[in-house]
Structure formats: structure tokens, C-alpha cells
Amino acid sequence: MWLIVGLGNPGDTYARTRHNIGFRVVSELAQRHRLEFTHKRAHARIAEGIIAGQRVALALPQTYMNLSGQAVVGLRQWYKIDPATELLVVYDDVDLPFGVLRLRERGSAGTHNGMRSIITLLGSQVFPRLRIGIDRPPPAWDLADYVLGRFTPEQEAQLPDIMQKAADALETVVREGMAVAMNRINAPPPKPKREQKRSSDAPDSSSDTNTSNASDG
């Protein structure tokens, strides 16, 4: 099975903040598969069901961000999972540009207090995670104020597409495994094809002479 945990803070006050993008993506995945958060256990709201033929539990910790590890450790014990292969944590990352997704099988917490809590209480950095870029704060901003602030209207308009892609990434992990998902999600976007143009000194194509094309740039 997979335990997929979205990180965030409970309550309407925080619902649309940058720090709650993990909540929103996991909720998007639940809505897509018509799973409802009807269970409460280990300080988390839980939706259980089947995705891509695999048993899954989707979790939204209710401990507030800095204590996320309490919920994750409790759920690990409840479901008897191996975090290295059956836990997937979804969270915001200020070290990635806005909207960029990155899948990793292990790693440090960086500046993220929720991840720091999970790593500390699990006693391991070895568990999969999906990081969602929210960009760095402006130089004069306090980090806490930034992550607890809302996205700009321009960013908010892009979020539905970003959350769809993030939910797609989670489905790929469940269906095909981390190796396939990482190759697909972490691959750089394809470079646009360079437009071909006729060399300025090439003969006109209407003539009987051969023409030549040169790459732009």
C-alpha cells in the first residue's frame, strides 16, 4: 500500500497559503478518485481507497505543520508500513521555482519544519517525497510570513494546472513506482525546436539551383 501525506496547517485561516499546497494536492487526488476524508486517526484526517489497483491512505495531519511527525509516526504504526517504500510526503519548497515538481527517494528537510519533524521522529531521511516549488521570498521578507502568506493572483490562476500535474505524479508513483515516476517528473522540459530559416544568401527556391537551410542561431 501507499500512505500519501500532504503537509499543511488545519483551518480556514491557512487553507490557501503557500505552506498548504501539500494539503491541496492530496485533496485534489482524493477528489479525482472520489475518496472522502471520513476517518480520523493519529492526529490526521484520512481517506482510504484504491488508486491504480493499489490500496492507498491519503492523510492530512491536523497537528499544525511543525508537529507533522507526530501524525506520520502514528500512521506508520497504524498501517504497519515501511517508510522507505510505502510513505510519500507532499510539501511546499522555497528552494524550487514556483510550480516546479521534484520527486526524491530521500533527503534532508532543508528549511521545512514539517519535514524536519517527520525526519526527527521517524529517525530516518529515507522516504519518498514530492516537493512543489513556491519560489523564494523577496529579500526583505521573513520566511515564516512568506510561507504563511497567500499566492499572488497570477500564481493562484496557475495552481489548478500545477495541482493536476502533481496529482498525476502521485498516481504515477502508485501505478509504476518511484523509479519510473522520477524519470518522468524530474526530466527537464523538452527544448523547443529551433525554427529553421532560409539563409539570407540562399538562391530563391523558384530557381533551378539547389537551396540550403541553416539552423537559426
Swiss-Prot record:
One of its GO terms (biological process) is rescue of stalled ribosome. One of its GO terms (cellular component) is cytoplasm. The record marks 9 as: Discriminates between blocked and unblocked aminoacyl-tRNA. It is found in: Cytoplasm. The active site is at residue 19. TRNA binds at residues 14, 64, 66, 113. GO terms for molecular function: peptidyl-tRNA hydrolase activity; tRNA binding. InterPro entries: Pept_tRNA_hydro, Pept_tRNA_hydro_CS, Pept_tRNA_hydro_sf. Keywords: Cytoplasm, Hydrolase, RNA-binding, tRNA-binding. The record marks 92 as: Stabilizes the basic form of H active site to accept a proton. Its main location: cytoplasm. It catalyses: an N-acyl-L-alpha-aminoacyl-tRNA + H2O = an N-acyl-L-amino acid + a tRNA + H(+). The keyword Hydrolase applies. Its EC number is 3.1.1.29. It is an enzyme of class 3 (hydrolase). Residues 182-217 are annotated as: Disordered. Residues 202-217 have a biased composition (Low complexity). NCBIfam families: pth. PANTHER family: PEPTIDYL-TRNA HYDROLASE (PTHR17224:SF1). Belongs to the PTH family. Hydrolyzes ribosome-free peptidyl-tRNAs (with 1 or more amino acids incorporated), which drop off the ribosome during protein synthesis, or as a result of ribosome stalling. Monomer. This is Peptidyl-tRNA hydrolase. It comes from Roseiflexus sp. (strain RS-1).
